[in-house]
């Protein structure tokens, strides 16, 4: 299965340019699954501790109106997250989008940081805590949105449920890239699945500090590829049967 990860600009004008280039890359590579960064269709707002309802509603609207952008990735299956209003709550929701079926909710972010640059618990609430895999073409995918990935029991449970891919849309800073790659490698080892992540990237003088670097990690923790400023898109053809076989090897077969 051909999968694509990326790093996309937080700046609106640069994002538009990046999106056109991503669409061209996906078309050329004939990608089947594209993982997007966290809440990518609006500039990162949680850099500010003070919640702004006007900005929140603008972000929600931008994501609701993103279907034309997603169509540029078709026929690939696009995976990402959106800010949403649901049942009186503000949430960060993972989704799977395909031209044939449209937007499908997949998971609500559960673990929310609340610190400098990432005041997420001040901007929205945690979801229900439902970590249920979703189908994306021939792959079974388990979402862990950014901070969710550090709670590895969920990746292990995803592995027990047979997922081929752990999908981690991110918005993370420059000084933590190595740490997040460690998280991806650990998630792949405990699940026996490929781990994919895409991140946003900001300008040096932007208020938001977002460091880019998407990655694809194999089912045993081997880093298969990284994105960079020079190569912001990475597409690999994954043999999903390797994830299926990995479930029967150490440490996945060990019962808790």
Predicted feature descriptions by range:
Residues 79-82, 92-96, 132-134, 214-216, ...:
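Short beta-strand scaffold segments in enzyme catalytic cores
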Residues 59-78, 150-233:
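CN hydrolase (nitrilase-like) catalytic-core segments centered on the catalytic cysteine
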Residues 33, 139-141, 165:
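Structural motif
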Residues 20-100, 174-185, 190-193:
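Cys-nucleophile CN-hydrolase/nitrilase-fold catalytic domain and related Cys-dependent amidase chemistry
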Residues 42, 95, 107-113, 215, ...:
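Short beta->alpha transition motifs characteristic of CBS
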Residues 85-161, 174-182, 245-255:
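Active-site catalytic loop in hydrolytic enzyme cores
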Residues 1-5:
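Extreme N-terminal starter segment of soluble prokaryotic enzymes
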Residues 7-13:
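Short polar catalytic/cofactor-binding loops
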């Amino acid at each position: 299965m051909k999968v694509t990860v990326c790093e996309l600009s937080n700046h609106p004008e640069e994002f538009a340019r990046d999106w056109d280039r991503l669409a061209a890359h996906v078309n050329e590579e004939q990608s089947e699954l594209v993982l997007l960064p966290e809440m990518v269709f609006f500039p990162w707002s949680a850099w500010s501790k003070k919640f702004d309802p006007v900005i929140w509603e603008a972000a929600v609207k931008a994501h609701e109106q993103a279907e034309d952008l997603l169509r540029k990735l078709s026929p690939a299956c696009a995976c990402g997250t959106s800010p949403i209003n649901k049942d009186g709550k503000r949430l960060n929701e993972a989704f799977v989008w395909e031209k044939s079926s449209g937007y499908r909710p997949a998971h609500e972010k559960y673990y929310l940081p609340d610190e400098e640059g990432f005041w997420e618990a001040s901007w929205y609430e945690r979801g229900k805590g439902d970590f249920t895999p979703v189908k994306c073409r021939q792959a079974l995918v388990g979402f862990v949105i950014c901070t969710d990935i550090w709670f590895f029991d969920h990746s292990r449970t995803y592995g027990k449920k047979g997922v081929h891919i752990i999908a981690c849309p991110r918005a993370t800073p420059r000084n933590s890239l190595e740490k997040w790659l460690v998280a991806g490698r650990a998630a792949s080892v405990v699940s026996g699945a490929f781990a994919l992540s895409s991140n946003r990237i900001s300008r040096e003088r932007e208020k938001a500090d977002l460091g880019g670097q998407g990655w694809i990690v194999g089912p045993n923790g081997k880093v298969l590829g990284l994105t960079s400023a020079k190569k912001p898109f990475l597409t690999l053809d994954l043999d999903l049967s390797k994830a299926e076989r990995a479930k029967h090897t150490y440490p996945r077969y060990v019962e808790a």
